[in-house]
A protein has these predicted regions:
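Active-site-proximal betaalpha loop/short-helix elements
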Residues: 33-102
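Conserved short-loop catalytic and cofactor-binding motifs
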Residues: 26, 56, 105
Length: 170
């Protein structure tokens, strides 16, 4: 839906500075029930003897482009836009890519764990979508069903050489 567009920017300015339409579209709409379902999935996976989650990121400012790019910043990835859930078919590619909807998590999981994670999501009644894959080409792209890539950048252009922080859970 056309919500949560520019929320990260609009949240940093005084109310009324932009037109009401821009501010209304920037407001993220929360859904406590879906938030709890997503939390239950993540918690269940993390509590398993072998956690299938390689990396996880929430959809905050800049939506899919921020979340999914950070999941694959070490190797690159290709996102199939036709696999992304879309509630409004009139959205532009930019609106789909940068939508800051709430209660969405991006998970990087091994291919062999997809069906297991899907079963956990189904048990918790949380929607799950497999939307892309890692590529190893150090590029991050969104590709439409017709093959057009409205977003295609080298990972280095997005992240530069910022220091990395690694946390290990024991």
């Amino acid at each position: 839906y056309r919500i949560g567009l520019g929320g990260g920017s609009v949240s940093s300015v005084d109310t009324g500075r932009y037109s009401s339409g821009i501010e209304l579209n920037a407001v993220q709409r929360a859904n406590a029930e879906m938030q709890k379902r997503a939390y239950n999935v993540v918690r269940a996976l993390c509590e398993e003897d072998t956690n299938p989650v390689v990396s996880i990121h929430d959809h905050g400012s800049a939506g899919h482009v921020n979340c999914l790019s950070e999941l694959v910043e070490e190797c690159g990835g290709l996102i199939d836009m036709s696999k992304l859930p879309i509630g409004d078919k009139t959205l532009s590619a930019k609106e789909i890519i940068a939508n800051e909807s709430q209660e969405r998590m991006g998970l990087l999981i091994q291919e062999e764990a997809i069906e297991h994670v899907r079963k956990v999501a189904e048990r918790e009644r949380a929607p799950m979508y497999v939307v892309g894959e890692t590529t190893g080409d150090h590029r991050f792209a969104f590709q439409q069903a017709d093959g057009v890539r409205p977003f295609d950048l080298a990972v280095e252009q997005m992240f530069g050489s910022s220091p990395k922080t690694y946390m290990v859970d024991k």
